[in-house]
Amino acid sequence: MGINHKVIDQKFDEDSVIETDPVLCSKLIVEGKNKSARALLSTTKDESYPVLTADTLVFTPSRKIVGKPENYEHSRELLREFSGTTHSVFSTVMISTTEQSLLKTCETKVSFKNMSKEEIEEYVLSEEGVGKAGAYGIHGPAGKYVTSIEGSYTNVVGLPVLSLIHI
C-alpha cells in the first residue's frame, strides 16, 4: 500500500479475552493490542503517530472461536471441521491517535470442499497453516480447498484492505 510504518512488538495476551461472540471478541482483542501499543509509544517521540492494530479469528461451524492452531492435532481438527462446510473469518482493524480511534470489523464466509484424510495430513505436515488463524492460508496451497468466499478475500488473508481504506 506504500505506507511508511514501524512494527511495534506489543505484548497483549489474546488468550485473556474470553468472549463467545466473534465480533465482540475480535474488537476486544484489537482494543487490547491497541492499548498495549499506545502504552509502548507513550514514552517515545512517536507518541502522536497513528497506530494500526488488527486481528483475525475464525468462527467454526460448531460455533467456536479460534485463532492460530495450538499444534498439528489442533490443525487437523480444524481442517476436518472445515471440510465440506462453511465457516466465517472475522477481522477487526483499528486506527488510533492520541485523540481518537476508529474501528471496523469485517466478516467473510469461506466454504471448503470435502477434504480427504490424506489431503488434510499433507497440508498439516507442510506447515503452511502454522501461525495462521484457522490453520490455513487462503493465499497459499490451501486455496485449492476453498470452493467459494462471500466477502473480502483480503480479510481471509489477514488484513481487510477495503475496511481499512474506509475507516
Q: What is the role of each PLM region?
A:
Residues 1, 165-167:
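Accessible peptide chain termini
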Residues 1-9:
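N-terminal G-site helix/loop of the GST-like fold
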Residues 9-16, 161:
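Short, acidic/turn-prone active-site loops that include or flank metal/cofactor-
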Residues 20-165:
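Anionic-ligand binding patches
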